[in-house]
From Swiss-Prot:
The keyword DNA-binding applies. It comes from Agathobacter rectalis (strain ATCC 33656 / DSM 3377 / JCM 17463 / KCTC 5835 / VPI 0990) (Eubacterium rectale). One of its GO terms (molecular function) is DNA binding. CDD domains: INT_XerDC_C. GO terms for biological process: cell division; chromosome segregation; DNA integration; DNA recombination. InterPro entries: CB, DNA_brk_join_enz, Integrase-like_cat_sf, Integrase_catalytic, Integrase_recombinase_N, Integrase_SAM-like_N, Tyrosine_recombinase_XerCD. Belongs to the 'phage' integrase family. PANTHER family: PHAGE INTEGRASE-RELATED (PTHR30349), TYROSINE RECOMBINASE XERC (PTHR30349:SF81). This is Tyrosine recombinase EUBREC_2677. Keywords: Cell cycle, Cell division, Chromosome partition, Cytoplasm, DNA integration, DNA recombination, DNA-binding. Site-specific tyrosine recombinase, which acts by catalyzing the cutting and rejoining of the recombining DNA molecules. Pfam families: Phage_int_SAM_1, Phage_integrase. SUPFAM superfamilies: DNA breaking-rejoining enzymes. Its main location: cytoplasm.
């Protein structure tokens, strides 16, 4: 049966089983493709022409921001490549469409380093001032999480998905399964970070084994993205920090700090798990303070004397 809805279901199963995409990506694909199916009003994919796609894209531009439209088009385009690959359609209507975007560059938001230090200080202070063992253990785990976010640039989804077998604290190495099931290895280069992770693992060992995730609640359940976000908000409030801090901002700060320290951008790309260096290059626009330092201290005009 050549039904668009049936092919969408088959494609999502293919993405899960063959392409091994993560649940969040598949969820986004599902939303985009079901929306497309509901709007297009054509049940047979063979009858969808370039004109139909162009009209649909025009409608999306009226409803969504360019970034959202780009993502939705990418979802639909990947689906039609699948239909072509499976010989379900003879011609891909996307082949006759030229899509151009001019998006404003949105720079990653970073956390000033003095605020990162203040944030970490607050967590350690809460731990030392804890009145109950429960509070003390929570603060220990929270310190381990924030230290890892800042010291490795790991994504929050990657952190929450870490298994006990992915973390080798003897050698200070973490195996990360990133976007698209891409593997990368990260080193823990700071001894203080390594020590707090070891202390956390020893204290939470039973809970970690119980849920098979490295970061666990005290009831032995894996930590969710949302629970980490709530924890970040809690310590930002306790620190009296007048800045909305998200877990991903630690990743941006990690990358920008390394770039400002003259680390080769290709090393940063590898550590962040970016598929293209073009993605990493966004951080070159952020390092304004480094640019100023270079122009003050490196430009030859400073040696001119009249």
């Amino acid at each position: 049966m050549n039904n668009l809805q049936t092919h969408i279901s088959s494609y999502l199963e293919y993405c899960l089983a063959q392409k091994r995409l993560d649940e969040k990506t598949i969820k986004a694909y599902r939303i985009d493709l079901i929306q497309f199916y509901n709007e297009i009003s054509i049940s047979d994919p063979c009858k969808i022409a370039s004109y139909d796609l162009e009209k649909y894209i025009e409608k999306m531009h009226l409803k969504y921001k360019p970034k959202s439209v780009r993502r939705k088009i990418a979802s639909i385009k990947a689906f039609f490549h699948y239909l072509e690959y499976k010989n379900i359609i003879l011609q891909n209507p996307f082949n006759k469409i030229q899509i151009h975007f001019r998006e404003p560059v949105i720079l990653p938001k970073t956390i000033p380093l003095y605020i990162v230090e203040k944030f970490l200080f607050t967590i350690y202070k809460q731990r030392s001032a804890a009145k109950t063992n429960y509070q003390k253990r929570n603060a220990l785990r929270d310190a381990a999480i924030v230290e890892l976010l800042f010291s490795t640039g790991i994504r929050i989804s990657e952190l929450c998905n870490l298994k006990i077998s992915d973390v080798n604290l003897i050698d200070g190495v973490i195996l990360i399964y990133g976007k698209g099931s891409k593997e990368r290895i990260l080193q823990i280069g700071n001894s203080s970070v390594l020590n707090i992770l070891k202390e956390y693992k020893n204290d939470f060992y039973n809970e970690i084994v119980q849920c098979n995730h490295f970061f666990s609640s005290q009831s032995g359940k894996p930590l969710s993205d949302q629970s980490v976000r709530r924890m970040i908000n809690k310590y930002a409030s306790l620190s009296s920090i007048d800045l909305h801090i998200t877990p991903h901002m630690f990743r941006h700060t990690f990358a920008t700090s390394l770039l400002e320290a003259d680390v080769d951008i290709r090393y940063i790309q590898e550590m962040l798990g970016h598929s293209s260096i073009n993605i990493t290059q966004i951080y070159t626009h952020v390092a304004v303070s480094k640019q100023k330092d270079i122009l003050i201290n490196k430009h030859p005009r400073k040696d001119f004397h009249f």
